Amino acid sequence: MSVQTEREDTAAGHQRMPRPTEDWQKQVARRKRIQFAIWAIVVVVIVGGMWWPLLGFVVPIVMLAGIIGGFFRGRYVCGWLCPRGAFLERIVGRISPERPIPQWLRRPAFRWAVFAALMGFMALQIAQNPGDVNHWGQVFVRICIITTAIGVVLAIAVHPRTWCSFCPMGTMQSAVGGSRAPLMIAEGCVECRACERACPMNLKIVGQRNPTPLPPSPSTERGRAVVNAPDCLKCGECVVVCPKRVLGL
């Protein structure tokens, strides 16, 4: 595709099918390396935070990074840079039965109730001694312990990313940028659902296509449809396993 054509396509508001599958294979491998490099952070915060409470400030830093990132790429931070998500997916996931995540856990009412409960708990705890920075750190460590424990139990009983389906920060990211960098399906999908089996969030993909198709991609000349999946982690696992190479981010 020429630079001029690419600019015209962008100016017209068209979303193009991006990287080829071979490139996404490299991206998926890179994501895996990143996850193995950062998963131990959650263990350091939980264990080390008992003696050094200031380690707890890693928690709000990750939370803030997730919210800011959400405005640009939805739940990208969840899928690539969240230490707990990496821990649940790569470490605890080895002993998970990988059962389907119950759909009621994804319902907005439940998710926002969890968000309100967690934020309320954090505010009440901090209010007990708001002038002590170490107390703030202890509160963050306590929250990390509680939520990670819930995540581990759910991962062992159901699916590695069960907690992530209603994680308060994930909910925020979905709310502010769930439509950013969307997953797209080009013409030629045979509905084999290999993408859904590979998805770490256990998302429904094939049946969530936007009924209004996008204009054909200049690079492939195939029509495309945006997948309505605000909880997509932008991990590329589905892109790599697609036998027809019709998926893209």
Regions found by a protein language model. Give the residues of each.
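Non-ligating segments of multi-cofactor redox enzymes
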Residues: M1-P215, S219-R222, P230-L249
